[in-house]
Amino acid sequence: MGRGFVIVGFLALALASSAAATIRPYTVYGVSNRYDRTNLVAQGLDIGEKAWPDHVVLYGTKAQAMSLTVQGYRVKPQMPDSTDDFPPADSGYHNYAEMVQDVQDFAAAHPSLVHIFSLGTSYEGRDLIGVRLSDDATDNLSEPGVFYVGQHHAREHLTVEVVLSIMHMFLEKPQVSNLIHTRQIYIVPSLNPDGAEYDIIGGSYHYWRKNRQPYQGIYGTDQNRNYSYRWGCCDGSSGDPNDETFRGPSAFSTPEDTALRDFMLAHPNIHDGISYHSNAALILYPYGYTYQDIPPDMTVVDHNTFVAMGAEMHRTAGYTAQQSSDLYITDGDWNDWMYGALHKYPITVELSGNSFYPPDEFIAGEAHRNWPAAVFVAQIADCPTKIVNVSCGTGGPRPAPAH
C-alpha cells in the first residue's frame, strides 16, 4: 500500500530515538484477577485490554518487563506478530490518506445523505475527519444523534476498518433506511491519526498506543486517559510521560480529545454511542474508575440500562459484557466522561482477534459481527432507558444525579 511521502531524515531520527526503548509484547504470568491487573496498570504499565485466567500481555520495554520479573512475575517475551505492517497481502487496511479518500468517495457517491465534517485537527495537523449520515442537508439538532468513533489507540487499526464498514452498511442495508430519516448518525473513523501513521512508519509494527504530542521531551499521551471525569483519580492511569497509560499533564491536554469534547458539547442531541477498541472481545460500560456497580454518581435506572445494552450487544456480537472496571480500573476514559460528565449512554466495544494486527481477511467478518450492535445503539438513541421500560419524556434522557 502507499505510505505517502516521508522525509528520510525525520524517519531516521524517529526510528533511532525509539530504538533504545522499543515496545514489544511480553506474556506476564501470575496475574489472575482484576486486582492483579489494576496493580500493574497503577504502575503505568500497558497490559492491553485482554485478560486470560492466569496471565496478561504487557506491551512495553525490556526494562519494564525486567521490573516485573523482580516483583516475582514470570515474564516471557513474544515474537512480533509480523515483520511488516500492511503488507500487500493485507491491502484491505487503510492508512490515513486512504481512509480520508474512502470517506470522500463515499460522500461523493451519496451527496444528499453523507455530509463530511471535521472534529478539528490532530497535534501534527491531520484533519480528524468524520461523516454525518442523514437526509437533512444541515445538522439537525432536534433529531436524536448517535456517535461512533475508532482508534483512540494508534495500534488498533482494526477499529478504523470496522467503523468504515459500518459507515458503508448504513446506506447499503435497506432495512435500516428509516434511521437515515430519523437520526443524525455521526461517525469518526480515527481519533488518533498521528499515532496510527507513526505505528506503521518504516513498514513495520511499533506497537504504538498513544498520540504523538510531546511532553517533557517524551512523545505521547494515552487519549483514553485524558478525559476530565475522574481524571487521574484512582490509579487507573499514569502521571509519568514514559508510561503507556500517561494521562497527560492535565485533562483535555490533547487536541484530539479536546476536539471531541467540543463536538459533544455542541451536540446535545447525541444520547449514546460506541467507542471501538481491540482486541479483548468485550462490551464495556461505565464506570471504569470504581469497582462499585452503582456508585453515588450513577442511578439504578442507568445501571440497569447499561446492563440491558450490554446483554443485547452480547446476544448479537457474542462478546462478554461487563462493567469496565471488571477488566481493571481506568480513570479519565471516554466511557466515564460521556456518562459522568454529559449523561450520555456510551459503550466501549473491544473487538476480537489474536493480536493488534490481524490480517485483512479478518476485517469483513468482524465488521458484520458488530453491525447489529451498531444498529441497536442507533435505534435506541431517542431514549436509551426505554429498553428498561423507563420513558424519557419530551426532554430526552433524564439527568444524572448530582456529582
Question: Model regions: which residues?
Answer:
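Positively charged n-region of N-terminal signal peptides that target proteins for export
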Residues: 1-5
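Bacterial N-terminal signal peptides
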Residues: 6-14
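M14 metallocarboxypeptidase catalytic domain recognition
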Residues: 19-403
